[in-house]
Design a protein with these regions (language model features):
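N-terminal helix-turn-helix DNA-binding core of bacterial DNA-binding proteins
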Residues: 4-47, 67-80
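Residues within the DNA-recognition helix of helix-turn-helix
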Residues: 52
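Alpha-helical residues within the helix-turn-helix
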Residues: 40, 57-58
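Amphipathic alpha-helical dimerization/coiled-coil segments
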Residues: 1-4, 8, 80-108
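A short, surface-exposed loop/turn module that caps and links secondary-structure elements
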Residues: 44, 49, 103-105
């Protein structure tokens, strides 16, 4: 393992290890959205959505573009898609669809 990789991995996975951020990623996987659309979709305060978008955009997992007066957020599919595929493949192979899978919410 390269020196410093542990720190990089920790920072990367810490950015993802948040239910609100994962929900944002899940919604953006359907297509680009504004903060207002994310607020409506997730039922959370605008400040909470903005707070959680910040680390995702800083790490370039989510990208932002200006459309008129609004910022629209979209996934960096080049990075996110392989991660989501790896998680799905791992769960299919090792969780056998069971409710006792430690990867499922509440099982840890």
């Amino acid at each position: 393992m390269k020196k410093g990789l542990t720190e990089l991995c920790y920072g990367f996975f810490s950015t993802l290890a948040n239910p609100t951020r994962l929900a944002i990623i899940e919604h953006l996987n359907e297509g680009p959205m504004s903060v207002t659309e994310l607020v409506e979709a997730l039922g959370q305060e605008q400040s909470m959505i903005s707070h959680n978008l910040r680390p995702l955009t800083r790490c370039k997992l989510v990208k932002r573009k200006r459309e008129g007066k609004n910022n629209v957020y979209y996934l960096n599919h080049e990075t996110i898609n392989p991660i989501l595929t790896a998680v799905e493949n791992h769960a299919e192979k090792y969780c056998e669809g069971g409710e006792n899978c430690p990867l499922k919410k509440g099982a840890m």
